[in-house]
Regions:
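Active-site helix of classical SDR
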Residues: 118, 154
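The beta1-alpha1 cofactor-binding region of Rossmann-like NAD(H)/NADP(H)-dependent oxidoreductases
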Residues: 57-69, 100
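C-terminal helical subdomain
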Residues: 177-178, 197-241
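Conserved glycine-rich cofactor-binding loop
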Residues: 14-15
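Residue(s) in the substrate-gating loop at a strand-loop-helix junction
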Residues: 138
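Substrate-binding pocket helix/loop in short-chain dehydrogenase/reductase
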Residues: 94-95, 102-107
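Conserved glycine-rich Rossmann-like NAD(P)H-binding loop of the short-chain dehydrogenase/reductase
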Residues: 28-45
Length: 242
């Protein structure tokens, strides 16, 4: 199935995996709706991509924002073929440090953001009889480690949501979950805990993937034949053990 002519919503599109995915899909002929909070970044990226890109300032933790995003994409493109729920944060910390505000923020962005993204397009996709939901999780959604209990919990939730959606919409909606390992993006900037920051260099002392590696996986999933779906894709740097 060709990506050309597809209409795709991408959240967290202002940088990293989201921006790389937007560029790759647009280069393959897709129409992309870029969603993020940073208007300046969205404008720059849309200008770089050209006429295949539109953008909308969106807070994924707002259900109304996400519903408006879906409606804007449908109005602009006439349809939505796929959504890439990519927005996420990773403020790692030990549970004993009680960074409760960060826990709440992770739940809002990493879990509710995915749910709101699905809700924004699901009725439309079911009415059309086809669609593709791609959720960007993490290898942390397949395990957990010290300091990542809450982050891993949110990513395990994404796995459960994806699997539930797949079973509820089997035969109509394609559902793909991508589990990246270390990727060279801004994700680590959300870590504020001084204990974690002090040891982060030793913990991740290997070369990460480029955002383009994950964008390639998204493109491959969208481009796969209509009668099949890549449900789970795990991508790690060759040196990453966990």
């Amino acid at each position: 199935m060709s990506t050309e002519g597809k209409s795709v919503i991408i959240t967290g599109a202002s940088s990293g995996i989201g921006a790389a995915t937007a560029k790759r899909l647009a280069a393959a002929g897709a129409h992309v709706m870029l969603a993020a909070r940073r208007e300046d970044r969205l404008k720059e990226l849309a200008a770089e991509i050209g006429p295949n890109a539109s953008w909308r300032v969106t807070d994924v933790t707002s259900h109304n924002d996400m519903l408006s995003l879906g409606q804007a994409a449908m109005k602009h493109f006439g349809k939505v073929d796929a959504i890439v729920n990519n927005a996420g944060i990773m403020p790692l910390s030990p549970l004993a440090n009680r960074r409760v505000a960060e826990w709440d923020q992770m739940i809002d962005v990493n879990i509710k953001g995915v749910l709101y993204g699905i809700d924004a397009v699901l009725s439309h996709m079911l009415e059309r009889g086809e669609g593709h939901v791609i959720n960007i999780s993490s290898v942390a959604g397949l395990m957990t480690n010290p300091t990542s209990a809450v982050y891993s919990g949110t990513k395990h939730a994404v796995k459960a949501i994806s699997e539930g959606l797949r079973k509820e919409t089997a035969g109509v909606i394609r559902v793909t979950t991508i589990y990246p390992g270390k990727v060279n993006t801004e994700l680590g900037l959300s870590i504020k805990d001084p204990d974690v920051l002090a040891g982060i260099g030793d913990r991740f002392n290997y070369k990460g993937l480029d955002a383009e590696n994950i964008a390639e996986a998204v493109h491959f999933a969208i481009d796969s034949p209509r009668n099949m779906v890549l449900n789970d894709i795990v991508i790690r740097p060759i040196e990453q053990i966990l």
